[in-house]
């Protein structure tokens, strides 16, 4: 009698938090106009451990353990300004402890954050069609993510891996038009 058995395992633990708040600025002072929307996300994943087969050394992820994103929007009539702050915690490049361990000159990497801004103008045509023209600055402060091992973001880097979801392009601008067909 034989049976296929997947003896590998993966242990993960984590928590997610979200908070949203919207208010009219006239509620603060009658002379103010517009609407402010704030939104925040926090993810903490302290454990992500795998083993490929019984007796194999445990492998620990080298991804950051904490991530946070905060969105802010101010809308006044047909104009809006958006800001997004994205952060991840530092982490370790060491994925295996004990037999098979690799020792790195820089075993840990630091935390990292970026800031994006968007200015949008909503345009309404005579037939009721609505379009938006926007100007966006990604990574406004030209931050460079720390280099890690065993991972790669897109477009990647000639110097090694970077945490997933990050890029090494630096600051860039986008101008565009959005509309519904």
Say what each PLM segment does.
Residues 1-96:
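Gram-negative outer-membrane beta-barrel transporters
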Residues 11-15, 64-68, 111-115, 129, ...:
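Residues that define the transmembrane beta-barrel architecture of outer-membrane proteins
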Residues 16-24, 116-122, 177:
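Short, well-ordered amphipathic alpha-helices
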Residues 18, 35-39, 71, 80-82, ...:
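Residue-level detector of the transmembrane beta-barrel scaffold of outer-membrane proteins
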Residues 30-32, 100-102, 129-130:
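Short glycine/proline-enriched turns and hinge-like loops at secondary-structure junctions
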Residues 46, 87-96, 121-181:
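C-terminal beta-signal and adjacent terminal beta-strands/loops
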Residues 82-116, 120:
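Extracytoplasmic gating/loop element in the C-terminal half of outer-membrane beta-barrel translocons
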